[in-house]
Structures are given as C-alpha cells and as structure tokens.
Amino acid sequence: MIFVYALLALVITFVLVPVLIPTLKRMKFGQSIREEGPQSHMKKTGTPTMGGLTFLLSIVITSLVAIIFVEQANPIILLLFVTIGFGLIGFIDDYIIVVKKNNQGLTSKQKFLAQIGIAIIFFVLSNVFHLVNFSTSIHIPFTNVAIPLSFAYVIFIVFLQVGFSNAVNLTDGLDGLATGLSIIGFTMYAIMSFVLGETAIGIFCIIMLFALLGFLPYNINPAKVFMGDTGSLALGGIFATISIMLNQELSLIFIGLVFVIETLSVMLQVASFKLTGKRIFKMSPIHHHFELIGWSEWKVVTVFWAVGLISGLIGLWIGVH
C-alpha cells in the first residue's frame, strides 16, 4: 500500500499544478518581488504563487485514504491537522499579499499568534486527549540521557513549530530551493520513522515526499509557480511536528540545517545593523548574499541542496542511534 500512497500523492500534485497555474494567472494571483532584491529576480514578477495548494490538497486526499487502511492512524490525523492549520495561515497571508499587490500580508503579530495557536492545539490533542503519546523530555543522541521539561515542553513545542515554520518560509526565495530541501528532509524522516517502528509517521513522510516530487518540476528554475506561504509555512510546521512525534527533536538541527542557517543569517543581519549600523551580508537570507557575489541562482540552489543532503544524512544517523 505504501507504493499506492506514494503514486497517488505524486500523480495528484503533478496533474493539479498545470490545472491551477492558468487559474492563478487568470485571477492575477502573481508574486510581487522585493525591489531591493537581486535585479535578476524582477523578471519573476507576476509568476503565479499559492502553488502550495496543489501539494497540500494532494497530501490531504492521500492521507485520508491512508487513514482508512493504516492501523493506529492517529499520528497521520495529527500531522494532517498541523498541515491544514499552518497551510491555512499561509493561504490567508498569500491571499492578502496578492490582493493588495505588495509583499506584506498578515502582520507578524497576527501570524505568530495563529501559529502559536496551532502549536498549542497540537499539544492538547496529543498529550491531553492522547491522540498520540510522546515523551516530554529531550533525548540526547548516543546516550541514555533525557532532559525532562514537563510543562515547559509546551513552550519548546511552540518554539520549534513556529520557528521552523518561519525558517522554511525564509528559505523559499529561490526557484526549487525549499522544495528540494524538503524532499531531502522528508526522505530522511521517512527512513528514520520506519527504522524506529513508527510506520504511520513513515507513511505520512512518504506522502509528503512524493507530493513534493510532483511539484518540483514546475518549481525549479525557471519556476512556473511558487509554493507561497501556503506551502512553506505548512512544510516547516510539519518538519517540526515529525521530529517531536519521533522524540528526535535534535535531529531537526541537521536534517533542517540549511533552514536553520538561513534563519540565523537574517537574525545576525538584523542584530548587526541595529548594533553597529553595518550589515554582515550583502543581503539576507544568505541565499541572496551568494547571488549578489556572482553565483547563479541554480548554483546556489544545487550547493544548498548538497549541503542539505550531507547534513540530512548526519541527522538520520543521529536519529537511528
């Protein structure tokens, strides 16, 4: 059945994207490009966004099919809730952006409050209503040591889900970058899940992986469609949730290393400018810095994918030991 889920997720996305693109163009749901960004990006103005709707719909449909046949499908139900929750926040943000024809959307406060709400509901559904059971301790790799957090684990979950949701969002600035890194990440978590005996989570990772594979051909340079916040916020939230449900939170640092680096580059840039009036990078997130020093967009993407693959394998090794 795993092959069926994979094929279904792949086909649905691959078929939906070319159907959605003309609809988005007709509705003028095109991406606005930052004027201060690399000049090479200006030609992307008007490229349809909100393409994440295609793979999210594929994930929802395929997951509902899987829930019927998979024993102990509660993990899939919970992951589906997170997918829809974070995806809905991204959809609202995208909708406001394309209607107003600017790069604003939801305010930071509105977005954070909504993300925090989804994270808290996730914790309540899992640990209060016991849809799934996972430890409220952080396990240290290669040891039998676990750091109990008790109630503070709620804060940790919120930090991880909200932080990683926005990390993937920041990374989604080059054609295919976030999509490719997510494919690598879900591949690692799929293998990890099956090795750890978490079959339902593994199946969901397979669904994620193949839904994104169906989207990638339309998203690589030159992109015919962008996933938008609809896709990126959902992907980040799912990554964090999977690491939490596997009790392998620290593996996320490596499996999502490029996302972490991208986020840190923004934080360092802002802090440096506020404290010294000088910028560390030519532009942040850091993928734009490499563009501005002369790298082609495709070179940045492939190098970042390679880094993601190597760090992902390290994260996988950590997770299964």
UniProtKB/Swiss-Prot annotation:
Q: What Gene Ontology biological process does one annotation of this record name?
A: cell division
Q: Quick one: which pathway?
A: Cell wall biogenesis; peptidoglycan biosynthesis
Residue ranges spanning the membrane: these are: 1-21, 50-70, 76-96, 112-132, 140-160, 176-196, 200-220, 225-245, 250-270, 300-320
Intrachain disulfide bonds:
none
Name the needed cofactors: Mg(2+)
Q: Name one GO cellular component term.
A: plasma membrane
Classify the protein's membrane topology as the record does: Multi-pass membrane protein
GO function terms (MF aspect): metal ion binding; phospho-N-acetylmuramoyl-pentapeptide-transferase activity
Under catalytic activity, the entry for this protein gives: UDP-N-acetyl-alpha-D-muramoyl-L-alanyl-gamma-D-glutamyl-L-lysyl-D-alanyl-D-alanine + di-trans,octa-cis-undecaprenyl phosphate = Mur2Ac(oyl-L-Ala-gamma-D-Glu-L-Lys-D-Ala-D-Ala)-di-trans,octa-cis-undecaprenyl diphosphate + UMP
Listed EC numbers = 2.7.8.13
* Keyword Signal tagged: no
Question: Where does this protein reside within or beyond the cell?
Answer: Cell membrane
Query: Which keywords does the record carry?
Result: Cell cycle, Cell division, Cell membrane, Cell shape, Cell wall biogenesis/degradation, Magnesium, Membrane, Metal-binding, Peptidoglycan synthesis, Transferase, Transmembrane, Transmembrane helix
Q: Which InterPro entries match?
A: Glycosyl_transferase_4, PNAcMuramoyl-5peptid_Trfase, PNAcMuramoyl-5peptid_Trfase_CS
Family listed: Belongs to the glycosyltransferase 4 family. MraY subfamily.
Under PANTHER family, the record lists: PHOSPHO-N-ACETYLMURAMOYL-PENTAPEPTIDE-TRANSFERASE, PHOSPHO-N-ACETYLMURAMOYL-PENTAPEPTIDE-TRANSFERASE HOMOLOG
Q: Briefly state the protein's biological role.
A: Catalyzes the initial step of the lipid cycle reactions in the biosynthesis of the cell wall peptidoglycan: transfers peptidoglycan precursor phospho-MurNAc-pentapeptide from UDP-MurNAc-pentapeptide onto the lipid carrier undecaprenyl phosphate, yielding undecaprenyl-pyrophosphoryl-MurNAc-pentapeptide, known as lipid I.
Q: What protein is this chain from?
A: Phospho-N-acetylmuramoyl-pentapeptide-transferase
| Record organism | Staphylococcus aureus (strain bovine RF122 / ET3-1)
- The protein's gene is named mraY
